[in-house]
Amino acid sequence: MKHIRNFSIIAHIDHGKSTLSDRLIHECGGLTDREMAAQVLDSMDIERERGITIKAQSVTLDYKANDGETYQLNFIDTPGHVDFSYEVSRSLAACEGALLVVDAGQGVEAQTLANCYTALEMDMDVVPVLNKIDLPQADPDRVAEEIEDIVGIEAADAVRCSAKTGVGIKDVLEVIVEQIPPPEGDEEGPLQALIIDSWFDSYLGVVSLVRIKNGVLKKGDKFKVMSTGQNHTADRVGIFTPKQTDTPELKTGEVGFVIAGIKEIHGAPVGDTLTHAKHGALEPLPGFKKVKPQVYAGLFPISTDDYESFRDALNKLSLNDASLFFEPETSSALGFGFRIGFLGLLHMEIIQERLEREYNLELITTAPTVVYEIVQTNGETIYVDNPSDLPAINNIEEMREPIVETNILVPKEYLGNVITLCVEKRGVQTNLVYHGNQVALTYELPMAEVVMDFFDRLKSTSRGYASLEYNFVRFEPADMVRLDILINGDRVDALAMIIHKGLIRSKGLALVNKMKELIPRQMFDIAVQAAVGSQIIARSSIKAMRKDVTAKCYGGDVSRKKKLLQKQKDGKKRMKQVGNVEVPQEAFLAVLKLND
């Protein structure tokens, strides 16, 4: 056991986690030169295209150190994006240490801090590594100072490497062996294995990635899942080297996979404990805290026949993504679908893209909303995440919106722009600290503002240099109202949104004008209105297409023309009473992109 090292690789987006992982695999001979693909561990198409890591992946490597001993390194490549921070905390629960990778050109960024604090809270040893020293703008000495100054861990003698060229990779491996402690656990004790991740394979059933904390799990053992109490037989156990490799057993301290032919999707929930069916452990291991979705949106299949396959797809995804929450929803405009909870906008985009790609579904998304706390006049408190579930205005005593604490790191020349943006988003500044060239800003912002387009605008006002991370702090009373869009006097439920009172006029006008552009002209006039309660605050009309009915009259009496025009007018009036308007798909998406 003293030759096992379990560690995660944590870093901000684009600081080179996945490339470093590739390099470590290559160095330890996990794959031949021919099999080395860039970003070996990013196996999803979306991950490769966007160049981001979404799912944490694990790899087991053998490394012959300078002291002549062979060490088993189990490492987990983690995502860097703020939306996937729960993936990071799950991966850390399976390790004893973490490599904090920092780009020697960019320096410390917000996510570096957030992930590092997560690791320190779990009492882990954090080993800083300066990556990308081959870049012309790399300044490792300045960055090492920055790490000590902002993060507060020793970094003067941090390893310097370049994952791209392979310089200093040996040193990284040596540091891992020297500085990260071996796992602790009782090899003789009853089996306790923590499920770090599980996913569904259509041939093998549920594949679970586990970390053995105590005891040994052999192939053919009968084990039970502690939360459900169901028994299964381990058909195959093994490790990823990154290829699936079967082994006869998994020993204490190791990280590997178990396949037990579990066919139902929630048979092995993430964060659960496995133990032997007979003489098993009595206590489960402490799991992970459940992540609460922050953003909700309705997803509807374009053709109603896809509803069943949409539900199956969601079930399969939710096995692999513990943070996904969904419930059925119906909309008069869009039919049957699901209300889905996400961790953030990137998460929402990724899930929608995975559903469309991996399960061939065509989906419509409604505008994302956050959860509001509402105190009704009868004294009870309810939580609403869907604008159409909002009680009538006269039943609402008080509406409270979620406030997030946002930590922003930004170079000082862009500070003014960022402050202007935060003020525009109704933010309250709580802290501002200078660290050399960087400024750390802390703002309390309404989550609804952060969710919509804050990230993109922050990046554009700071030319991409600012970085942020946020967490929910509390609900706070706010003047929020529901803005409805009426088309020909009918409310379209999928276009409703909850917004701040100060923005009603501008938002209402913008929406109405956008709808006017997007809804095709009909044979009769269409009124598009924005309303709050029964008060109309903006309106525009989509003019009817009209046929020139008097074209065939040449000369003759004017009463002839009048008769034809009157006949047309009556027809249009009748049409308007019975006609209904199809709202095109683009109109629903327009709500999301109002600020562009």
Curated annotation (Swiss-Prot):
Sites where the protein binds GTP: 14-19, 131-134
GO CC term (a single one): plasma membrane
Top EC category: hydrolase
Keyword entries, A-Z: Cell inner membrane, Cell membrane, GTP-binding, Hydrolase, Membrane, Nucleotide-binding, Protein biosynthesis
Places the protein is found: Cell inner membrane
Main location: membrane
GO molecular-function term, one example from the UniProt record: GTPase activity
Domain tr-type G stretches: 2-184
Catalytic activity: GTP + H2O = GDP + phosphate + H(+)
Family: Belongs to the TRAFAC class translation factor GTPase superfamily. Classic translation factor GTPase family. LepA subfamily.
Function: Required for accurate and efficient protein synthesis under certain stress conditions. May act as a fidelity factor of the translation reaction, by catalyzing a one-codon backward translocation of tRNAs on improperly translocated ribosomes. Back-translocation proceeds from a post-translocation (POST) complex to a pre-translocation (PRE) complex, thus giving elongation factor G a second chance to translocate the tRNAs correctly. Binds to ribosomes in a GTP-dependent manner.
HAMAP family, per database record: LepA
The protein, known as: Elongation factor 4
